[in-house]
Amino acid sequence: MKVTLFVTCLVDMFETNVGKATVEVLERLGCEIEFPEAQVCCGQPAYNSGHVEAAKEAMKHMIETFEDAEYIVTPSGSCATMFHEYPHVFKDDPKWAKRAQKVADKTYEFTQFIVDVLKVTDVGASLPGIATIHKSCHMTRLLGVKEAPGILLSSVKGLIVRELPNVQNCCGFGGTFSVKMTPISEQMVDEKVDSVMETGADYLIGADCGCLLNIGGRIERLGKEVKVMHIAEVLNSRS
């Protein structure tokens, strides 16, 4: 099975270890990974900021780059969601809408692909300790991926998963929201950190680097001892 990886901007620039873990997990599960170097941003930051035409240019480039893939997998629920929004963005342009739909139909978030396409629930990972899961807004509410991360983590040897209080609440990142609405964002992430600490977890695990960078940065500034990990890193662990 051939998988074309969309690594995302944040992974490429800040969390390359997440990209490596994603590839290693998928290869162990029998996937052949392709990485088109022509890939760029999915267009979400520009689109959400109102720069629609600039976003469309990036989206067209991404459609051209990925439309011949068998499966498109990304370690980000947010970016996967944006791919699924492409047909809506091009709804008034039949030619591009058709090409966008072709791409959207074969785009999956990392854990979604493992559980729903590969039909795997245990990747053979092990990580001793207590964890709690942050469920990102785009991944759960827009993409509809709610159970896959928990299913996979429940099979990680030695890992105890505790429910995060107020798990449905946003962490305050929201892309440019954290910059444009900083006081509100800070209050939201403080509440999220309080919820994490309430669980007594050793690890905070999530599937979106934006959320994890935001929460992890706050945890570090507050001097809390919780390790923040992307779920790909956890599933690649052999502790």
UniProtKB/Swiss-Prot annotation:
- What does it do? Is involved in L-lactate degradation and allows cells to grow with lactate as the sole carbon source.
Q: Which family does it belong to?
A: Belongs to the LutA/YkgE family.
Its recorded name reads: Lactate utilization protein A 2
Where does this protein come from, organism-wise? Answer: Bacillus mycoides (strain KBAB4) (Bacillus weihenstephanensis)
Name the HAMAP family for this protein: LutA
InterPro entries annotated for this entry? Cys_rich_dom, LutA
Disulfide pairings: none
Name one molecular function that GO assigns to this entry.
oxidoreductase activity
Q: Which Pfam families match?
A: CCG (PF02754)
Q: How is this protein annotated for GO cellular component?
A: cytosol
What is the gene name? lutA2
**Any single GO BP term:** lactate metabolic process
